[in-house]
Amino acid sequence: MAEFSGEPRGEGRRIVVVASRFNEGVTVPLAEGAVSALVGKGVAFDNIDVLWVPGAWELPVAVRRALSSERYDAAVAVGAVIRGDTPHFDIVAGETARGLMEASRDFDVPVTLGLLTTDTLEQAEARAGGVHGNKGADAALAALEVLDLFDRALPANDYDEDGE
């Protein structure tokens, strides 16, 4: 049996961070955490692009457009959807996550989820550099780890377009 895992190594990588402006008191620290984590693991600052979109709903289309350029090894999506009094939260959170997953699958590129879905602003702040860490940084490290895993165990030329 072979067992593989990756390490968050950033040397030579080009990463796009796509961030939602809505709830910017939370999303700015998430984006900053992602960039800081990437640089801390060796991604050159000039190899990181940050794209700001109006809200979480726009994250998937911006990620898709970025990946279609073939300039990036991975995408890190960060945003914050905070529950309100209407079902809007469920629609935005679920469909945004689905759209990001589909972009990852369609482009065969890691797209990591730094999208907070919380009941309160305080819960979001706790996950954007507060007592629960920075989920933007966590998502950035996950992207690098998956890229390294792919390099070690799953090179792109080892399977055809159908994943076989």
Curated annotation (Swiss-Prot):
Bilayer-spanning residue ranges: none
Binding of (2S)-2-hydroxy-3-oxobutyl phosphate, residues: 85-86, 127
Pathway: Cofactor biosynthesis; riboflavin biosynthesis; riboflavin from 2-hydroxy-3-oxobutyl phosphate and 5-amino-6-(D-ribitylamino)uracil: step 1/2
Domain of life: Bacteria
CDD domains noted in UniProt: Lumazine_synthase-I (cd09209)
The name this protein goes by in its record: 6,7-dimethyl-8-ribityllumazine synthase
Residue positions binding 5-amino-6-(D-ribitylamino)uracil: 22, 56-58, 80-82, 113
GO (cellular component) term, any one: cytosol
EC number(s) given by UniProt: 2.5.1.78
Keywords for this protein: Riboflavin biosynthesis, Transferase
BP GO annotations: riboflavin biosynthetic process
InterPro entries: LS, LS/RS, LS/RS_sf
Cross-referenced Gene3D superfamilies: Lumazine/riboflavin synthase (3.40.50.960)
Residues of the active site: 88 (proton donor)
GO molecular function terms noted in the UniProt entry: 6,7-dimethyl-8-ribityllumazine synthase activity
Family stated for the protein in its record: Belongs to the DMRL synthase family.
